[in-house]
């Protein structure tokens, strides 16, 4: 379902987004 797709996208995006946020903090 849609949630499954969003979950898959999140798993691919988060590893890239988290380090960027960490650098800004």
UniProtKB/Swiss-Prot annotation:
Tissues showing expression: Expressed by the skin dorsal glands.
Alphabetical list of InterPro entries matching this protein: Caerin_1
Highest taxon of source: Eukaryota
GO cellular component: extracellular region
Example GO biological process: defense response to Gram-negative bacterium
Residues with PTM Leucine amide: 25
Secreted in keyword set: yes
Subcellular location: Secreted
Key words of the record: Amidation, Amphibian defense peptide, Antibiotic, Antimicrobial, Secreted
Pfam families: Caerin_1
Signal peptide: none
Role played: Antibacterial peptide with wide spectrum of activity.
Family assignment from sequence similarity: Belongs to the frog skin active peptide (FSAP) family. Caerin subfamily.
Designated name of the protein: Caerin-1.10
Organism ancestry: Eukaryota, Metazoa, Chordata, Craniata, Vertebrata
């Amino acid at each position: 379902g849609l949630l499954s797709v969003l979950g898959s996208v999140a798993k691919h995006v988060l590893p890239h987004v988290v380090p960027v946020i960490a650098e800004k903090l």
